[in-house]
Amino acid sequence: VMPRPAKKIQDIYFFFYGTGYKKALYDFSLLAGKIALPPKFTFGVWWSRYWEFSDVEMKNLVEEFRLHDVPLDVLVIDMDWHLVNRPEWFNDKGERLDDQAGESCGWTGYTWNRSLFPDPEGFLKWTNENQIQTCMNLHPASGIQPHEDQYTEFATAMGIDPATKKYVPFDITNKKFAQNYMDIILHPFEKLGIDFWWLDWQQWSTTNVKGVNPTFYLNYVFTSDKDRRGIRPLIYHRWGGLGNHRYQIGFSGDTKICWPSLDYQPYFTATASNVLFGFWSHDIGGHMNPDGYDPELYTRWIQWGAFSPVFRTHC
């Protein structure tokens, strides 16, 4: 992607429909694209939690669902699937250091945490054999750091001498970087059995190309990559602005654990239809700042989750 020379011209669209709400939305879809239909399994039960789960614990979890005759369709593996807490990433006070990109060490990662997943190939074979769709979390802002298993191959592909141990900055607007990112980093995980990604971008809002929003463009690149390979696109992502209804499942977290938060979610979900956004995935049960767990709050949240677009527990 690159900037185009712009003259003093601006396109302005006026929509006048009175009470013709459905007609307005239909015409907006002609302009901004149709809502992509997610695969059938996305309307089943998702399980996720921010915790250091091992492969054995996740297998036991799946068996617990079956023992109690509760369906489970999607297993979301949060960021601890990769290296997060190496000793050299902390100072003497136990404070986390920054990496070469200026981000927190361990926030971005592509190297399996073998203490939790000693046999990732075997684990993903097991999930596939048990008809569990697997999604993994990505925080890509730190680029490819020197400790990663893929660093030497990736740095070489980008024209960086691996001996320098210089990280490869993340630049999704660079076609060469984007292609190598898919081919060298992500596609091998998908061949192992990862079904789709939780693209958890939460850093800067601009790119090297003026006017290009990184959240929006990431959603586009991830979706078009699968489309080009003849794979039905599916992405679980953060909202990047108008037009993101083309990229299926939205992540609304990180939700506070409180009654007002639950009270707001039905309104928030319903009004998203005003911009054709139909598939929010909420942190059912909440995620942040618990003031003590309230069993009734959790029960009511589960009830709402059953009627929300995507039923993903997270508490």
Regions found by a protein language model. Name each.
Residues 1-315:
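Catalytic-domain carbohydrate-binding cleft regions of carbohydrate-active enzymes
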